[in-house]
Amino acid sequence: MSRYTGSIYKKSRRLGFSLLENNKEFNSGKKRTYGPGQHGNKKVKLSNYGQQLVEKQKLMFLYGLNDRQFRRLYRVALGRPGVLTLNLLQVLESRLDSLVYRAGFAPTRRAARQLVNHSHVLVNGKKVNIPSALVEVGSTIALKEKSLEMPLIKNTLNKPADFIELVDKDKKVAKLSRLPERSELPADVNEAYVVEWYNRLM
């Protein structure tokens, strides 16, 4: 399965979940706040399998992953001590593109991914252009000095997440101070269903 590049608004309405994480897709001013298609406004009771699939898709589309990437991260979470469901979310949040977004350096996860892809991001002072790179606690994330004048960056007003320390606001330097707690992560995802899905396959 390749990475989804279509309309975030349509996908959010289909999943009943804000992929932009601000519920903008469901604002009353929009033409439709329900799923696309002829029967998009009808409630359908999902089977256990269907619920597992929906919850997996929520995380895949939220973090911009394909199935192969998601499986790899699931295996990483599986190898860590602790609660698997929380481990999975923490691994997803440890991706470099996710941390660039969480640090408030980009307005969306897609924009954060582009910043990493185009070599605007430093990890511990070294250029890293792989969005999927996993960042360890204590590492610093920064934007290149010449990138700070980009309108995308200058116009981003997002505040950093509580688990990220803003070392230098003007120079866009942040530090992953700790792994996030469950209460700091998307509430509208039931990651237990995702674990059930992969336990069945692996």
Curated annotation (Swiss-Prot):
InterPro entries: Ribosomal_uS4, Ribosomal_uS4_bac-type, Ribosomal_uS4_CS, Ribosomal_uS4_N, S4_RNA-bd, S4_RNA-bd_sf. GO terms for cellular component: small ribosomal subunit. Residues 94-157 form the S4 RNA-binding domain. It holds the Pfam family S4. CDD domains: S4 (cd00165). Transmembrane segments: none annotated. GO terms for biological process: ribosomal small subunit biogenesis; translation. Keywords: Ribonucleoprotein, Ribosomal protein, RNA-binding, rRNA-binding. GO terms for molecular function: rRNA binding; structural constituent of ribosome. Signal peptide: none annotated. PROSITE patterns: RIBOSOMAL_S4, S4. Belongs to the universal ribosomal protein uS4 family. Part of the 30S ribosomal subunit. Contacts protein S5. The interaction surface between S4 and S5 is involved in control of translational fidelity. One of the primary rRNA binding proteins, it binds directly to 16S rRNA where it nucleates assembly of the body of the 30S subunit. With S5 and S12 plays an important role in translational accuracy. This is Small ribosomal subunit protein uS4.
